[in-house]
């Protein structure tokens, strides 16, 4: 294995404890190969770009994923610590984003494969289903020095099984997984202020109650026909029967949106793309209730676009003292989760893996998601000032650095560390290493 940049060695050092010495040597090759390999992120493509095309014991590298003993949960805890250390100021609120995504896969031997709705290809009138794996990812959402918008950095990813193939007779929905992951993060960070932001698919009273029990602020989209209630009236002394948990039902948000006397307030909020936008909001507190579950106290925000470009929408927050501006700022940050899913597919080879064994499947995709966060922190280590070099062309002007620029910077530093050794100041000839020449001519031009 060639030498690595000192900045990368520092970030990799905490992960050494997860592996034995022999497995760690092979794991490093796969991690660096996944960063350098163009196109598919298979084990063989990682070996090829590392100059190990002639490695006869290539099965040892496959065993890192399908047989070796190590925990993705412990790796997620270590990665979360790195993200907080390098990107979250001390004492600041940690915003968490969670969502599920479908990795399209086919094959009879893939046990966790199911048929799911394809959110990317589907519309309101036309629903598209596909076979694949459902992944639920939790990310740290926050600012990075080189971008105006927040970035979502994955650190914990789990595989959701379809209901027909649920193991041990119990099926966990995406909401169940997010609740369990949220409790795990609270166990890791018992003293920090946490905010969990999810989309409308996770708008469940049970999840809101779980967040409230763990002292985690819960933010999500709210249906306009949601059942909202007033607090219960004081219980009369000596009155028999169970104490009421809710009072009279409040006016529906649909009615509030349709009324002409709704007391709208105008606010300027942080918007997508790092801009500002003026919106009209109406905010109150209520009890959110669904049958079979205890009601939870929330602050709802009904939002209207004065320009008429957006339809009315509502959002909720379990922190009753939060302002509408703060709630909407958290809601806008959630879109970075979708951007991360798209970036990992475009640049890290999500959906190009070819493993079929259950342990390898359960590890490969979480590792690739984790590499997104690892590359981001590593780019910050290479450029402490936050001024990343941006790749521009005559026909395309990029205003700020993106993940592709981070990955380009990391690759450049790796190649320079390996092959660009300093030459004497008086030298007339700089010799190009043969290993670099063979990689440039034979490996990098291979089709993706």
Predicted regions and their residues:
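Single, function-defining residue in the core of a domain
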Residues: 1-15, 19, 77, 108-110, ...
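Gly/serine-rich nucleotide phosphate-binding loop at the start of the catalytic core
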Residues: 1-63
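Generic alpha-helix structural propensity
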Residues: 26, 38-42, 56-60, 70, ...
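Short coil/turn segments at secondary-structure boundaries
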Residues: 26-28, 43-47, 76-77, 341-347
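Conserved short loop/turn motifs at secondary-structure junctions
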Residues: 31-34, 64, 194-201
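Short secondary-structure transition/capping motifs
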Residues: 35, 50, 64-73, 123-128, ...
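Short alpha-helix boundary/capping elements
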Residues: 35-40, 51-54, 69, 105, ...
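Active-site-proximal, Lys/Arg-enriched surface segment
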Residues: 67-157, 283-287
């Amino acid at each position: 294995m060639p030498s690595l940049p000192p900045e990368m060695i520092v970030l990799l050092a905490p992960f050494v404890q997860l592996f034995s010495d022999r497995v760690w040597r092979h794991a490093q090759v796969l991690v660096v190969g996944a960063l350098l390999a163009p196109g598919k992120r298979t084990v063989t493509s990682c070996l090829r770009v590392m100059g190990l095309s002639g490695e006869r014991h290539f099965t040892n590298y496959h065993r890192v994923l399908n047989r070796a003993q190590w925990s993705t949960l412990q790796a997620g805890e270590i990665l979360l610590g790195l993200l907080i250390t390098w990107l979250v100021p001390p004492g600041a609120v940690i915003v968490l984003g969670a969502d599920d995504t479908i990795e399209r896969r086919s094959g009879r031997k893939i046990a966790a494969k199911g048929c799911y709705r394809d959110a990317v290809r589907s519309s309101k009138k036309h629903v598209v289903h596909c076979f694949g794996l459902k992944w639920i990812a939790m990310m740290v959402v926050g600012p990075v020095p080189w971008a105006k918008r927040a970035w979502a950095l994955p650190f914990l990813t789990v595989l959701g099984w379809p209901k027909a193939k649920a193991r041990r007779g119990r099926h966990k929905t995406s909401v169940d997984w997010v609740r369990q992951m949220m409790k795990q993060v609270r166990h890791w960070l018992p003293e920090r202020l946490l905010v969990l932001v999810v989309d409308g698919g996770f708008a469940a009273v049970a999840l809101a109650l779980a967040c409230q029990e763990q002292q985690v602020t819960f933010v999500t989209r709210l249906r306009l026909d949601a059942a909202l209630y007033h607090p219960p009236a004081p219980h009369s002394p000596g009155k028999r029967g169970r104490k009421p948990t809710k009072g009279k039902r409040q006016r529906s948000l649909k009615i509030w949106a349709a009324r002409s006397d709704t007391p709208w307030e105008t606010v300027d909020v942080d918007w997508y793309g790092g801009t500002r936008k003026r919106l009209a909001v109406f905010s109150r507190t209520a009890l959110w209730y669904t049958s079979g579950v205890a009601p939870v106290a929330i602050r709802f925000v009904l939002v209207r676009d004065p320009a008429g470009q957006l339809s009315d929408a509502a959002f909720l927050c379990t922190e009753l003292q939060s302002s509408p501006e703060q709630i909407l700022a958290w809601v806008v940050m959630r879109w970075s989760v979708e951007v991360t899913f798209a970036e990992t597919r475009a640049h890290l080879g999500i959906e190009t893996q070819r493993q079929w064994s259950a342990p390898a499947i359960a590890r490969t995709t979480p590792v690739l998601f984790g590499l997104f966060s690892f590359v981001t922190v590593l780019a910050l280590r290479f450029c402490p000032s936050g001024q990343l070099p941006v790749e521009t062309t005559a026909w395309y002007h990029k205003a700020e650095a993106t993940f592709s620029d981070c990955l380009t910077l990391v690759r450049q530093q790796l190649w320079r560390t390996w092959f660009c050794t300093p030459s004497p100041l008086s030298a007339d000839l700089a010799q190009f290493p043969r290993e670099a020449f063979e990689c440039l001519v034979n490996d990098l031009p291979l089709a993706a």
